[in-house]
Amino acid sequence: MSSFRALAERNVPRYTSYPTAPHFSAAIGPGEYAQWLGALAPDARLSLYIHVPYCSDICLYCGCHTKAVHQRAPVDFYAERLSDEIARLAEIAAGRRVTHLHWGGGTPSILGAYWLRQIVQSLDASFDLSEIKEHAIEIDPRHISTELTQTLAEIGVNRASLGVQDFSPHVQRAIGRIQPFEKVAHAVGLLHEVGISNINIDLMYGLPHQSADDVDASAQLAALLSPQRIALFGYAHVPWLKANQKCIDEAVLPGVVVRLAQAQKAAETLAAFGYVAIGLDHFALPDDPLAVAAREGRLHRNFQGYTVDDAEALIGLGASAIGKLPQGFVQNAVDMAGYMRRIDGASLATTKGFATSVEDERRAMIIERLMCGLAVDLSELAGDYSAEMESLRPMIQDGLVEFDGSRLAITKRGRPFSRIVAAAFDAYLPANAARHSMAV
């Protein structure tokens, strides 16, 4: 157990991208982004991500780019800038087909019915939305109404993610997010009434005062609502990055051994309810597109987690939003003032990014295959990975990883340590390891 504990306590990225965001630099700006956009083929398929960095209040555990707002004016002002950014992008990449659209935050539904409609209308005027396969939005179940769900159905939303984290009252008090099971069930019902039947529920383990039984009970209650997908994320305690997390006493956070038990117990419960484990921390019903893609080897991973999205480019809209194009990554200004200033200055909002090399793309493929399918055939890829395999030797000896000379596979026992296996192929990690969260 001591070796497992040491592994679990390692600081490694979640690998929603490679290279990861801490390595982005100001060497990539609006000019490079405009060139990359202009190089997209006319028939390129796009995925759009819209970031709304506002919430009615900030939960203590939150690690998102967001801030509390209690007045309407800042939200309206921001929504106007989103519309301006869409128009700016359309000057370069108008008419491209959009296959996936995701609203994140923050709480994107805080925009309200008017702006949700207006922004979709702006997108429709700028891009081809006729082939959208998935139109998803993140929702705070504490703030949902019939007007909101009707608007979501009207603009074409077909998947909703509900942030729950834990149903236990004492854990909810500890994280500053009170939402009884009945409130979440009500939100699911409202979504079903308007035909939005693809529901995701997000849970967390590793929260303050949370036991393995708490996580297990929350998994059971979530499964009783029959969502198509359930995510079980490990809480990332990074108070050096997120000031709100400084309000959480580290003494009441579960240790590594308990975190492992929490994740394992919940996974067993979800399996008993018929959910299939997807990658590191997702679960889906067998007929859900995510489960089908996993079986067929078509699963991908991006900044929203596991996805079936295979678009050629991801376009990020809004403050802090990240995009991915064939040439590399771009990120908008993280701070609100910087984002507004750039948009008002008739510029793209890009402030940093990363131009990827052939070697970066090769390693990104290895990491994605490990994170998605828990296996990769290194013989299919050019390169010498003997040093990486040597670093994984202890995990092979412990039965967490198997290697037959070409195919590297993470065992069932090793699944919780998938990020560590992926990290062996991260050429940039040593310089910034301390900036990431624990592996489990």
Residue positions per predicted region:
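Short amphipathic alpha-helical interaction segments
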Residues: 382-397
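A short, conserved structural fragment
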Residues: 396-406
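Minor-groove-contacting beta-hairpin "wing" of winged helix-turn-helix DNA-binding domains
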Residues: 407-411
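Short, amphipathic alpha-helical interaction segments positioned at domain boundaries
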Residues: 413-440
